[in-house]
Amino acid sequence: MLNINFVNEESSTNQGLVVFIDEQLKLDSNLIGLDQQHHGLISKTIQNKLQFTGKYGQIKVIPSVIKSGEVRYLIIAGLGNEEKLTEAKIEELGGKILQHAICAKISTICLKLTNRISRFTSQTFASLVASGAFLASYRFNKYRTTLKEAEKFAVESIEIFTDNSTEAAKLFEVKKLIAEAVFFTRDICNEPSNIKTPQVYAERIVDILEPFGVDVDVIGEREMKNLGMGALLGVGQGSQNESKLVVMEYKGGNKDVPTIALVGKGVIFDTGGISLKPSSNMHLMRYDMGGSAAVVGAMIAVAGQKLPVNIVGVVGLVENMPSGNAQRPGDVVTTMSGQTAEVLNTDAEGRLVLADAVWYAQEKFKPKCVIDVATLTGAITVALGSTYAGCFSNNDELADKLIKVGEEVNEKLWRMPLHDEYDAMINSDIADMANIGNVPGAAGSCTAAHFIKRFIKDGVDWAHLDIAGVANSNKASALGPKGAVGYGVRLLEKFIKEYI
């Protein structure tokens, strides 16, 4: 694991030295001194605008001209317009620096924060850069028996030279905890579905959360049947692996602090059931439990900080498999709420899982607010691509807060509409509702949201986050490799911390 230290005095044992320069390309007195030590290498580089313009995210790795000493490379990082810098951009810059260091095979680097960054203290800037680098260091290689030499290389340590190293280290300690929660989410999403059965996944949740003082209850199929969870159980009835409902309760606040319920879709693998998906890219359905993983990650981040809040997490863990015992198109299931649903498409299963999970959360814990997170519909990806997740809500203030926090942590949300006409599209001829809309190909993400909305009690604030387009990526980003993104952990953690 990457080791990050904050120091008041610069060490001479680092192979790479990082400095930051904005688009004005001006050197302050500290950078002038550093430039002189390196025989004008920094000033020569920024004078040649073909090499370096100072725009945000530009990284220039230059071999050092100093013959003695450990520093082999200078790494110049562009800040762009400092007035436009955000916390998310600074974190991404940290990730890019780490990636360039890996490409240049620089195993130890020092970040020198000599110039003042407008709007950010040096310790805040330092902790954000460190957070981005730490997030970018994530790898999932546990099933790789051989690695290429380039893949084996990793940056061993980062030393950050700042004027208040103690405060920077305290800030980073929290960010590191949140990053480790993101890593859990990425790990469990990347895990092959033959390994992370509902039982194994539930055990991992217990193992990770109980040391933080979170009460975890794993409910099996017999108890779910007694509770009347016909919708969730119907999804999993074709699998030989028993479905689980995992209930996590963190009581960090006083009794008068309202409870928030986080509910996640945990479809361990989604074949589509009898409404079978095409085989192309079906392997990516290992990520169909990304909503549940985001909920667990948020619980880790909140409980790890001992925040004075009351949070409940409920995740339904099922496999949607075809078999002689599988749910059929046209089946009618009775949900825990007593409402009935006609299953017109067994591949619209996530909303069935959520229907019972959100009802259970409301019945048992009486939350003020319910936020469900799910890789629910392909339709949201058609609408928003991989840039935004969809946000549906019955409360404008709740939606606005989530969207604002999403911008701040670069886990973006776009408000999507709820409307009576969408709700009417899920009416069924033989049951209370159908699990898909009655107009093929129309408003798929909106009708799915309305299905869940029918299980939200009056007076409960609710938001539904459809993360199908953002939970995993087929390309690397500044903050991590391709595969599971860990989307939602930082969004939910910051929302809970700032608004509860």
Swiss-Prot record:
What are the EC numbers? 3.4.11.1, 3.4.11.10
Q: Which SUPFAM superfamilies match?
A: Macro domain-like, Zn-dependent exopeptidases
- What does the Swiss-Prot or TrEMBL cofactor note state? Binds 2 manganese ions per subunit.
| Binding residue positions for Mn(2+) 1 | 270, 347, 349
Gene3D superfamilies listed in its UniProt record: Leucine Aminopeptidase, subunit E, domain 1 (3.40.220.10), Zn peptidases (3.40.630.10)
Q: NCBIfam families, per this entry?
A: PRK00913.1-2, PRK00913.1-4, PRK00913.2-2, PRK00913.2-4, PRK00913.3-5
Q: Which HAMAP family match?
A: Cytosol_peptidase_M17 (MF_00181)
Annotated protein name in UniProt? Probable cytosol aminopeptidase
Give the species.
Answer: Rickettsia felis (strain ATCC VR-1525 / URRWXCal2)
Q: Which gene encodes it?
A: pepA
